[in-house]
Amino acid sequence: MIFTKVDALVKDIDVDKYHIETVILSSDDLNKKIIRVKSDHGNEFGIRLDKGQKLQNGSAFFIDDHHVLVIGVESQDLIVISPKDMDEMGITAHILGNTHKPIEVKDAKIYLEVDPVVEQVLTQKEIAYTIEEVVLDKPLRHVNLTAHEH
C-alpha cells in the first residue's frame, strides 16, 4: 500500500475506534517525500506524499476502516538554548546563522543538533545551553529567506 497524503493527526483521531500500527522515524526522515516504512506489526508501507504534504510526529494514514498507521519520531540529543533576553537572542541568532545549521525555535527555546563546534562557540560567547533528549514534531530546518515577502 502506498500513501500519498496525510489523512489526519493522531491527536484528532478517536484511537479507541482503530487498531493502531506505528512506525518510528528519525526527524531527518520527516523531510523525505518518498519513503518505505515497516510498522511495529511488520507490515511494509510506501509513502509518496503529494506536493504540499509534509510528515510530522503524529501523522496518521488510514489503512482501512479499522486500521491506522501513525508516524512517531525517535528522540535525539539536541542542544537547547534558552536566551535570557532579547539581546542574547539576537547574538545567538547571529552566531547560529553564521554556522548555517538547521534549527527549530519553539516556546522561546532554540533547538539544534549536537555539534562540538557550536558548543565551543556558545561556551566562548558565554551563552548557556543544555543537551537534552528531545522528540521533535517537525524536522529541524534551515531558515528560508526566499519565502520572505512584504
From Swiss-Prot:
* Pfam families listed in its UniProt record: UreE_C (PF05194), UreE_N (PF02814)
Q: Where in the cell is it found?
A: Cytoplasm
- List the Gene Ontology MF annotations in alphabetical order: nickel cation binding; unfolded protein binding
Q: Which GO terms describe its cellular component?
A: cytoplasm
Sorted alphabetically, which SUPFAM superfamilies does this protein's record hold?
Urease metallochaperone UreE, C-terminal domain, Urease metallochaperone UreE, N-terminal domain
Major location (coarse): cytoplasm
Top-rank lineage group of the source organism: Bacteria
Q: Tell me one GO biological process term.
A: protein folding
- Keywords noted in UniProt: Chaperone, Cytoplasm, Nickel, Nickel insertion
Q: What does this protein do?
A: Involved in urease metallocenter assembly. Binds nickel. Probably functions as a nickel donor during metallocenter assembly.
Q: Which family does it belong to?
A: Belongs to the UreE family.
The molecule here is called: Urease accessory protein UreE
UniProt source species: Streptococcus vestibularis
Encoded by which gene?
A: ureE
